[in-house]
Regions:
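Beta/alpha (TIM)-barrel catalytic core signal, keyed to glycine-rich beta->alpha loops juxtaposed to Asp/Glu
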Residues: 4, 109-293
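Short acidic, hydrophobic short linear motifs in intrinsically disordered regions
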Residues: 320-334
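Distinct, well-ordered alpha-helical segments
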Residues: 56-66, 85-97, 115-124, 148-160
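N-terminal binding-site loop/beta-alpha segment at the start of enzyme catalytic domains
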Residues: 1-71, 127
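Positively charged, polyanion-binding regions of nucleic-acid-associated proteins
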Residues: 300-323, 352-356
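Conserved, mostly hydrophobic/aromatic
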Residues: 7, 19, 47, 60, ...
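Short, cationic-aromatic polyanion-contact patches
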Residues: 365-374
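A short, conserved structural fragment
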Residues: 355-365
Length: 374
């Protein structure tokens, strides 16, 4: 069975591996049932989900109707105002068929504007405290993607006494001196306060680039061989007092659980360096945060636009109730130095792609199409 340890200050004995239910975002009911049954085989007792993860909350809700006492359930919200966050929580409670959620997390709290809104008057933090006081949630946390997240989480902990944090952690990412320093400072603070540290991206190989997406891992191309997954998961589990959230693909889940089940000691840095070379591993956030994308010609422009839009989505640019028209998107990309010029057809096509994949919503107004995150 996968080992367990106390989940921060919550008093809960959680498996060191947490099921990341993005894997269920496109799953059928039969696939979801098989996946959740697999968790029980390995003794996994902790699920991380979110209302923006496609079918995930509904699939888990059907399962929790019979197995609620077997799992610690965490969900998230990307809403930044008190009212919208509470509405989002109500939706999650209904979908999950539960009276309360164990851990509610502010998702993607990694940009300054969103952070100020959440922490300010009428912000989502008020909803979090209110929901906890009413018994709708038990514990509160923050999550994020990208190179900036350790610093932002530290800032959040300095403002409010959150119970958990969630952020990327893998061997290659920790070779970035700036990220490693900020990450270690955050972990040190979390240990002092007994804040649970959850990590993601343990089996990330490299950005997808122009390669076909053969797995349901949105941000990155994953490692897929059992040996490579073993080494990566064992390296991540080598961080004491931390928890690893599984990758977002149900086909990879058995391999990740098998690796965690056999964990004894951390993979050596020498072995990890060899694997980086063997699999041509690359930092997955090298275009995010402070990167400035440039127009390098017609063959690369579309990819750059797509990556730039992903950054805006991560930063909360499209958060409801903001409905962004094409002209606003172009201006945002240009003003941040992400693009040197706007090419409307390419950007419009990239937006349409995000809509098809369910990451953005769109509707037509008198001034044209507008886009937002529901």
């Amino acid at each position: 069975m996968i080992p367990r340890q106390e989940f921060g200050r919550t008093g809960y004995q959680s498996t060191r591996v947490i099921f990341g239910s993005w894997a269920l975002s496109k799953a059928t009911k039969a696939e979801a049932d098989r996946t959740l049954a697999l968790l029980q085989e390995y003794g996994v007792n902790h699920i991380d989900t979110a209302p923006m993860y496609g079918n995930s909350e509904k699939a888990i809700g059907s399962w929790l109707a019979k197995h609620r006492s077997d799992f610690f359930v965490a969900t998230k919200t990307r809403r930044r105002s008190r009212k919208e966050a509470l509405d989002n929580l109500k939706l999650s409670l209904e979908r999950l068929h539960v009276d309360y959620i164990d851990l509610w997390q502010l998702h993607g709290l990694t940009n300054d504007a969103g952070w100020e809104k959440v922490m300010g008057p009428g912000g989502a933090l008020e909803a979090f405290v209110e929901a906890r006081d009413k018994g709708l949630v038990r514990f509160l946390g923050v999550t994020g993607h990208g190179n900036k997240v350790p610093e932002m989480h530290k800032r959040s902990l300095e403002r409010f006494d959150f119970d958990t944090v969630l952020l990327p952690y893998n061997y290659l990412l920790m070779q970035n001196p700036h990220y490693a320093t900020a990450f270690n400072e955050l972990v040190g603070l979390c240990r002092k306060r007994n804040v649970a540290v959850q990590t993601i991206k343990s089996i990330a190989r490299r950005p997808w680039g122009s390669r076909p997406k053969t797995c349901n891992t949105y941000f990155y191309e994953p490692l897929v061989t059992q040996d490579a997954i073993d080494k990566s998961v064992h390296w991540a589990l080598g961080l004491p007092d931390s928890f690893v959230i599984t990758a977002g693909d149900i086909q990879l889940l058995p391999k990740v659980l098998d690796a965690a089940n056999r964990f004894e000691k951390r993979t050596s840095d020498e072995e990890m360096r060899a694997m980086v070379h063997e699999f041509d591993m690359q930092e997955i956030f090298h275009h995010a945060a402070h990167a400035r994308l440039r127009d390098k010609g017609p063959h690369t422009w579309g990819g750059q636009v797509s990556k730039a839009l992903k950054e805006l989505i991560r930063e909360g640019f499209f958060e409801y109730p903001k409905r962004r028209a094409l002209e606003h998107v172009i201006k945002a990309l240009e003003s941040r130095g992400l693009l040197t010029e706007g090419k409307e057809a390419n950007i419009s096509n990239a937006l349409a792609g995000r809509v098809r994949k369910g990451f953005l919503k769109k509707s037509k107004t008198s001034n044209g199409w507008v886009y937002w995150i529901e």
